[in-house]
Amino acid sequence: MRHYEIILMIHPDQSEQVPAMLERYKGMITAGGGKVHRVEDWGRRQLVYMINKLAKAHYLCVNIEADQAVMAELEHAFKFNDAVLRHLTVLKKKADTGPSSMMKTVEREDARKTQQAEYQA
């Protein structure tokens, strides 16, 4: 089996359905004999350019270990899910289990926001 990193851009109006979507995709992976190594919810972020007249999207990063049949099934599910604006699948040499650089940035932004809120209070 190969290791993959999948980045998903979800429609911002569908943010509340993200956990259900994620569980469905994780179920597809484990049913096919794969493993989910890391799931990161990067939240809503500003887009560099507009996609389908949208300026923001909800980002997810998933690191998995799966075979080609499972990947084909996932790609098919991404294409026909209207809530998925874009998806990117990258083949990795090994499983990434630590936090990504993007997740470190998200955590740093959250810490800065809480610090500002405490300072203003």
UniProtKB/Swiss-Prot annotation:
Which InterPro entries does this one have? Ribosomal_bS6 (IPR000529), Ribosomal_bS6_sf (IPR035980), Ribosomal_S6_plastid/chlpt (IPR020814), Transl_elong_EF1B/ribsomal_bS6 (IPR014717)
- Bias class Basic and acidic residues marks the residues at 105-115
Function field: Binds together with bS18 to 16S ribosomal RNA.
Family to which this protein belongs: Belongs to the bacterial ribosomal protein bS6 family.
Look up keyword Ribosomal protein and say if it applies: yes
Which species is this record about?
Answer: Albidiferax ferrireducens (strain ATCC BAA-621 / DSM 15236 / T118) (Rhodoferax ferrireducens)
Q: Which GO terms describe its molecular function?
A: small ribosomal subunit rRNA binding; structural constituent of ribosome
Which branch of life, at top level? Bacteria
What Pfam families does this protein map onto? Ribosomal_S6 (PF01250)
- NCBIfam families xrefs: S6 (TIGR00166)
What's the protein name? Small ribosomal subunit protein bS6
Q: Which GO terms describe its cellular component?
A: cytosolic small ribosomal subunit
The entry's keywords? Ribonucleoprotein, Ribosomal protein, RNA-binding, rRNA-binding
Q: Where is this region: Disordered?
A: 96-121
